Amino acid sequence: MARYPKRQKVKRYRRSFYTREMRLKKGIGIAVLVVAVLAAAWVAAPHVLDWATHTWYTVVRDRDLSASSAVSESASSGAQSTAASEPAASSVPEKEPEPAVKGTDIVTGLWAEVDVTTLTDEAAIRSAARQLKAQGMTYAILTLKDTAGQVYYASQTAVGAANAAPTQVELTSVASIFKEEGLVPVAALTAFRDPAGARADRALAIRYQGQEYLWLDNKASAGGNPWLNPYAAETVQYIGDLIAEVHAAGFDQVLLENVQFPSSTSAKQDYGTTNGVDRAGQLTADIAAWQDRFGDAVTLWYGYSLAEVTGSSSQLGAPAAQLGVKNLLVKVPSSSTLDAAAREELTLSLTEAGVEHLVIRDDAASYFE
């Protein structure tokens, strides 16, 4: 049998028969298809997003909210509990801070005298102040003008400068250091019993009737001394100027002593023009003049003996409480004393007479407050 040889198969690829025109059409078709798909996606996108959002809110968020609501309720409950407790806490009144004590304020406490001649430097001043504070003192009296008329600081007044004491203290340092140590410094000034001042300026002095000689409270051979004239405006001005000086140096409280006339009522005394005003009336006017001049800037104290407070005397013309004195320091003589009941009775009677603050010095009873 005759064999015929196998014929070779011919593979035909479709692309082998693509023409240029066919390729162009195919490209255009693909481009059209892509555009159509994109357009369809653009149209469908809002609907797809709406569906996805709805699904999240209805399924996922509801689950999260249910968990967070429990936390919120717990927090809200805690906040309400805290809010409920706040009124209870705020209902307790807070303690108000105590107002600062001013230098002119009068406070309760013990008093003591200080020898100014020992206050020679800052160390001595501080040592004296600390000793007083350790003893429980509140007030410290420093005599800056004594009954001889000597002034223990550098006064700028003509009369004060002429009668400077051998020992001079630095007022500003004394006042500031005593305050730093918790004390109230009180400047003591003798008023009308001032022989040195009377001799330094005769216009301030009591004279003999019809003469230029200074009136003396005793014979010159017996140690008689002149006095300042309570009727003289120059005298009242001089004492007021001394008050102003010590206040400027830091002393907010001043004790005036010997605001009085000499005990003698001799017809030989020449007080100048009195306008018919008696002794009590003139002292009342002098005290009022100083009060008007300084007002609340300076706390003025007046020192008198127990006898001058409880009865009328030639020196005052009336009991001290009737002179318009508001702050009074009463000195009990060393020969007697007052018990607690007597002090209470004295305080009551003076308060009824118009005295606002009273300090009693009773050395025999070691009482000074």
Task: Describe every region a protein language model picked out.
Residues 186-193, 254-258, 277-315, 355-364:
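Aromatic-lined carbohydrate-recognition surfaces of secreted/lumenal glycan-active proteins
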Residues 45-53, 320-369:
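Substrate-binding cleft of secreted/luminal carbohydrate-active enzymes
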Residues 1-27:
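N-terminal Lys/Arg-rich, disordered targeting/topogenic segments
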Residues 50-107:
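N-terminal, intrinsically disordered, polar/charged segments of Gram-positive cell-envelope systems
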Residues 93, 146-190, 264-298:
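Aromatic-lined substrate-binding rim segments of carbohydrate-active enzymes
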Residues 102-113, 117, 192-244:
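Active-site-adjacent "subsite" loops/lids of carbohydrate-active enzymes
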Residues 123-151, 245-257, 320-330:
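Catalytic domains of carbohydrate-active enzymes, especially glycoside hydrolases
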Residues 28-46:
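Hydrophobic membrane-insertion alpha-helices, especially the h-region
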